[in-house]
Amino acid sequence: MTSKVLDLQQKGVEVIGFAAGEPDFPTWDHVCEAAHQAIRDGEFRYTAVGGTPRLKQAICTKLQRDNGLTYSPAEVLASCGGKHSLYNAMQAVLDEGDEVVIPGPFWVSYPDMAALSGGVPRIVMAQESNGFLLTPQELRAALTPRTKLVILNSPSNPTGATYSEEQIAALGRVLAHHTCWIITDDVYEFIRYDGARPKHLATLVPELRDRVIVSNSVSKTYAMTGWRIGYTAAPLPVIRAITTLQSQSTSNPSAIAQTAAAAALAGPQDQLEPMVVQFRKRRDYICERLNAISGLSVAVPGGAFYVFVNCRGVFEKTGVADGDALALQLLDAARVGVVGGNDFGSADHFRISYATSMEQIEKGMDAIERHLGSL
């Protein structure tokens, strides 16, 4: 959908874009300056496959400071974005036929990554009535002797579902009785609206420490999506396997981007909270507007910058059968770009990203309301 919106915009068509999953804020000044200095210093060469010593130490510092996790530089690796980090991890730990438990609604890439790694995605749909939060009972029922990996993402894309510390610990206690790997996709960890900074799963349930693979990136927290730096922290055998894989695929990430990422992770963090405050204002406004439109409903998300809109109530009057078809109709008739929910695991929904200005959000809500009200 993002490409469709961009194509129309390039043709001069005014489209309100709610599809892109990236912050609309600029990368922080001191991070950009670090990149400029790297250029002036001639950092143009290959680096070690897993990243520069400076970046790896910054990752370790961040994990200790923010998550209470102690890793050595040998146990972390820098990749070409958070998606690359997740793909590497699945390639490293999955064998043909291994089951991968994926809570749904889910980020669209998880099942495909699992399948490309030989795994069998096992989708466990969380209930909308429970805020799209997976319960310990639902997780326990999904685990089988063939379960090799569980993926946990909080806050979540596409729903914004955000687990409390108690809920994370409860899921961890279930996983403590199984011998599977756990990937925590922490890319939205600081974009949450309850003011909490819960401890990490591997801290709350220490016996899981040797089975947890931490996946993260600088993309969302520091508005650095285009810089393409992700990272993984994991037991040494996993990092060694990923290093071998990465050495024969992408090799090292951009040297200049690595220096910028190190500055982001190790430098001042004071610009994060103002960004979250703006996201919270947008969330509150967009949820109020959507819930006032007949046939639409949305559970207020606890984090990230998405709302997952239940649109089943407008299928009859719009003449569509699912969220994907409604998304195409909204693009064609209202010139609003949203993402249909089918690929996220729910045909009754569509996703809106509110990582855009309030002016655009207001225009987009007006256009959706006007279109649905005219039918």
PLM segments and residue spans:
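PLP-dependent class I/II
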Residues: 1, 8-16, 22-38, 66-375
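A glycine-/small-polar-enriched, mobile loop at the entrance of the PLP active site in fold-type I
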Residues: 16-22, 37-55
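Conserved N-terminal alpha-helix of the aminotransferase class I/II PLP-enzyme fold
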Residues: 46-79
